[in-house]
Each structure stands twice: as structure tokens, then as C-alpha cells.
A protein has these predicted regions:
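N-terminal export/targeting leaders of redox proteins
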Residues: 1-23, 103
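Domain-level signature for proteins that mediate thiol-based redox and metal-cofactor handling
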Residues: 18-19, 58, 62-63, 71
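Sequence/structural segment immediately N-terminal to covalent heme-attachment motifs in c-type
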Residues: 22-39
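Stable alpha-helical elements in mature extracytoplasmic
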Residues: 24, 61, 65, 91-92
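Axial heme c-ligation environment in periplasmic c-type cytochrome domains
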Residues: 35, 44-55, 68-98
């Protein structure tokens, strides 16, 4: 019985992680992030994998990116500024963590 419960719990956790990534992609689409960004390559703004690589050793990256996602920014990735986004602080943190999880 314990083995079955452990297996079900493990399967549930694995599925929860996948659902979370899908949820964050849906959030990025809903907030129009994907209009200027893609996961793999530069569109108007940098690709998310490039952003994750740039900040991989920065312990404060999630907080920094959450601020940029919410308030907008310019100069870090070229001439075109990123406009402020209509996201809550929680959504900005979730999106930042998701972007930084890209490999």
C-alpha cells in the first residue's frame, strides 16, 4: 500500500511541475509577453533561454526580472525598450522564475 501511495505521489508531483510550466506559458501568452519574446531566439526582445543564461549565476535575478517585467526597462538588450506590463507582483515573480528556469 505504501509503495502505491508513494508512486501516486511521485506521479502527481511530476505532473504538477509540467502543469506549472504550461500555466506559466499560458500566463506569458495572456500578458502578451510572447508578442516580443520566444523561448529559443530573439524576436523583438531576447529569447528566454538567452535571458536565463545571462542571469544564471545571479542570486537576485528573479527579483530583478520581476521588476523589469512589471515596470518595463531599456538598454539591457538593445535599443528597443520593453514597456511596462499589466501584471501583479505575484505574476511578475512567477514569470521571472519561469524564464530563469529555461535551459
Amino acid at each position: 500500500m505504501k509503495i502505491i501511495l508513494s508512486a501516486l505521489l511521485a506521479a502527481g508531483l511530476a505532473t504538477a511541475g509540467q502543469a506549472s510550466a504550461a500555466d506559466e506559458l499560458a500566463l506569458a501568452k495572456a500578458k502578451n509577453c510572447m508578442t516580443c519574446h520566444t523561448v529559443d531566439k530573439k524576436l523583438v526582445g531576447p529569447g528566454y533561454k538567452e535571458v536565463a543564461a545571462k542571469y544564471k549565476d545571479d542570486k537576485t535575478a528573479t527579483a530583478k526580472l520581476a521588476v523589469k517585467i512589471k515596470a518595463g526597462g531599456k538598454g539591457a538588450w538593445g535599443e528597443i525598450p520593453m514597456p511596462p506590463n499589466n501584471v501583479t507582483e505575484d505574476e511578475a515573480k512567477r514569470l521571472a522564475a519561469w524564464v530563469l528556469s529555461m535551459k
